[in-house]
Amino acid sequence: MPKPSKGARLGGSAAHEKLLLANLAKSLFEHGRITTTEAKARKLRPYAERLVTKAKKGDLHNRRQVLQVITDKSIVHTLFTEIGPRYENRPGGYTRITKIGNRRGDNAPMAVIELVEALTVAQQATGEAEAATKRAAKDAEGSAEVSEAKVDTTKADDEAAAEESKDA
């Protein structure tokens, strides 16, 4: 049985919320950044990230699923040819929400939601180097503990051999 999503529903009915999120996602992919209320930005973030993940896969099935939500073919084309490949090596976190203060008319909290830039080759190399350094440090700690244990056992063996020679 379908259950409503958690949190307050935007715009009243479920159908209105669905259309509102589709239009916000359409504007986000068209312009790269949009200014909206914090509540709408928080609801839009997982919705838009799911669409970008479908665009990263790039197959016909995912394209048709996105076309059910975003009916503008030119924006879907942009999503699949430019935005999806841009985040090919990023495992998530394609959007950023920045709070910008309250709206003048009704004092509603506002935010900017934008598509983050793709990781550059240098950033990817830096991330891989940091991961390798952490792995090396972890391996060094593990091997140091093993070598200390070996040293302790060899000392015990030497002492046992010395005692046996005294007894004999």
From Swiss-Prot:
**Quick one: a GO cellular component term?**
cytosolic large ribosomal subunit
Region named Disordered: 124-168
The record's keywords, sorted A to Z, are: Ribonucleoprotein, Ribosomal protein
Family annotation (Gene3D superfamilies): Ribosomal protein L17
Can you provide one Gene Ontology molecular function annotated for this UniProt record?
Answer: structural constituent of ribosome
PROSITE patterns listed in its UniProt record:
RIBOSOMAL_L17 (PS01167)
Q: Which domain of life is it from?
A: Bacteria
Cited Pfam families: Ribosomal_L17
What biological process terms from GO does the record include? Answer: translation
Q: Where is the composition biased (Basic and acidic residues)?
A: 131-168
Q: Which InterPro entries match?
A: Ribosomal_bL17, Ribosomal_bL17_CS, Ribosomal_bL17_sf
Cite the PANTHER family for this sequence. Answer: LARGE RIBOSOMAL SUBUNIT PROTEIN BL17M, RIBOSOMAL PROTEIN L17
The entry describes its oligomerization and partners as:
Part of the 50S ribosomal subunit. Contacts protein L32.
Q: Which HAMAP family match?
A: Ribosomal_bL17
Entry similarity comment: Belongs to the bacterial ribosomal protein bL17 family.
Q: What is this protein called?
A: Large ribosomal subunit protein bL17
Its source organism is Streptomyces coelicolor (strain ATCC BAA-471 / A3(2) / M145)
Q: Its gene? A: rplQ
